[in-house]
Amino acid sequence: MKSKKQTKLLLILDGWGYSKTTKNNAIALANTSVWDRLNQTFPHSLIHTSGKDVGLPGKQMGNSEVGHLNLGAGRIVKQDFTRIYNELQNGDFFRNPILRNSLEYANDNNKAIHIMGLLSDGGVHSHEEQIHAMLEMTSRQGCKNVYLHIFTDGRDCAQKSAKKYIKKLESKMKELNTGEIVSLIGRYFSMDRDNRWSRIRYAYELIAKGKAKFLAKSALNAIELAYARGETDEFIQSTSIKAPTSIKKGDVLILMNYRADRARQITCAFTDEDFQGFSRGTFVPTQFVCLTEYKKDFNLPVAYPSSKLNNVLGKYLSNLGMTQLRIAETEKYAHVTFFLNGGIEQAFNGEERVLIPSPDVATYDLQPEMSAFELTDALVENIESQKYDLIICNFANTDMVGHSGKLDATIKAVEAVDTCLGIIYKAMFAIGGEMLITADHGNAEQMINPQTNEVHTAHTNNPVPLIFVSNRKADIMKPGKGALSDIAPTLLAMMDIEKPDEMTGNSLLTFK
């Protein structure tokens, strides 16, 4: 009979930030009796999740990919956004061999170039400056027939801000005398990550075949028509600009999103010869270029390949022969697996995974509890098994519902998670385990932009809480002294394991 483990649990409450301001703060306004009791009883602090503290430029807000990379790496991880930003500053971007080769191919073979991606300054999945730079590269290389397929945001930025970004892009096009915006669609359709292929189909048919629900005279007109229909940027339906434009065999497609999770499905639709998501009709092969590595087995040209991270938490524990469980609902499954493991898709030896399906609803404000209770049931069952040295669990609610901008729904999401915390605490207490609770970034603590008084759907730069739940006595680092890169070393300290040299983060706990 196998011995029972002294299980440690890392709970990641996605989007659960901290703000002193209680107005329009879903976390402060919610009934959180369990959370309040944990804060009053156990060592707690605040840690950083944005900007240079997580490998991003300046005051750039954090996000789930960045957060989980830092959580698992135990060091500040230089992000793709930062790598590309730096190369834009020093000019290396325009010398990128993969991008240059794709443009040369188009010129040599008289093929069109299609640039697609999320157009905003949100900086979570993409940045408008990088799309502008790609357009400039086509101009420098004398490319003809350059088409732009725009994904509108409204999630990592204001809900109705698309016009601002379109105007800047059109100004750049005029300056360079190149490029034409031929289609426009909201990210809700083009950037699904939850296998809702019916959404991706709208984006694919728009870009590949020029098949759209609506036709507009210009990109700005497309946005005006969408607003008149009651849509915000995230949900703008497929629209062709001036006349339908389709992709021809051998055309170059460049996807300018750098974050993998919401780029994978649209990439599959354009590149997988055995694609099963929906009927594409006759498959049109293209020269598809990924800005970053969305998935290793795609075997596609990648402008910015991933940098390998050695001795991330999962691999380090695996090498020590320890057991671990990763558990989340669909929306955050990639984060507790692929991203937490430093961009490695395959599970490490001794690592098991449990996926709880996210509810099939149009938007999560319609079901704020999402699958939190099913997730909790599965988590408690695995806690009680005492099979694992470490369990890492993500609750998606406060981020995914927070993105809706609906305060009442987000309060319900917070309260659902709080109820689950009570159940999990009892299970961990019963086995004598220890629990570290934190978040990857803020969101739900700011539902209105205080400067504009508009609905706020994006992440924040606020710190996030950290609570150490244990019968052991410990001092915790003062608020503002730690960051997400310190969490893996802290977990190792809880397990009485020395951290590897690669982990430059520090334990935030001092045991008495």
UniProtKB/Swiss-Prot annotation:
The UniProt GO MF terms for this protein read:
manganese ion binding; phosphoglycerate mutase activity
GO biological process terms held by the UniProt record: glucose catabolic process; glycolytic process
Keywords in alphabetical order: Glycolysis, Isomerase, Manganese, Metal-binding
Q: What is its pathway?
A: Carbohydrate degradation; glycolysis; pyruvate from D-glyceraldehyde 3-phosphate: step 3/5
**What InterPro entries does the record point to?**
Alkaline_phosphatase_core_sf, BPG-indep_PGM_N, Metalloenzyme, PGAM_B_sf, Pgm_bpd_ind
Query: Pfam families from the xrefs?
Result: iPGM_N (PF06415), Metalloenzyme (PF01676)
Recite the UniProt cofactor note for this protein.
Binds 2 manganese ions per subunit.
> Mind naming one GO cellular-component term on file for this protein?
cytosol
Residues binding substrate are H125, R155, D156, R187, R193, R259, A260, D261, R262, K332
The cofactors named for this UniProt entry are:
Mn(2+)
Q: Does the keyword Isomerase apply?
A: yes
UniProt-listed Enzyme Commission number(s): 5.4.2.12
Keyword DNA repair recorded: no
Query: Can you tell me which residues bind Mn(2+) 1?
Result: D399, H403, H459
Q: Which residues bind Mn(2+) 2?
A: D14, S64, D440, H441
Q: Which residues form the active site?
A: S64
**Entry similarity comment:** Belongs to the BPG-independent phosphoglycerate mutase family.
Its assembly, as annotated, is: Monomer.
UniProt xrefs under HAMAP family: GpmI
Provide the protein name: 2,3-bisphosphoglycerate-independent phosphoglycerate mutase
Q: What is the organism of origin for this protein?
A: Vesicomyosocius okutanii subsp. Calyptogena okutanii (strain HA)
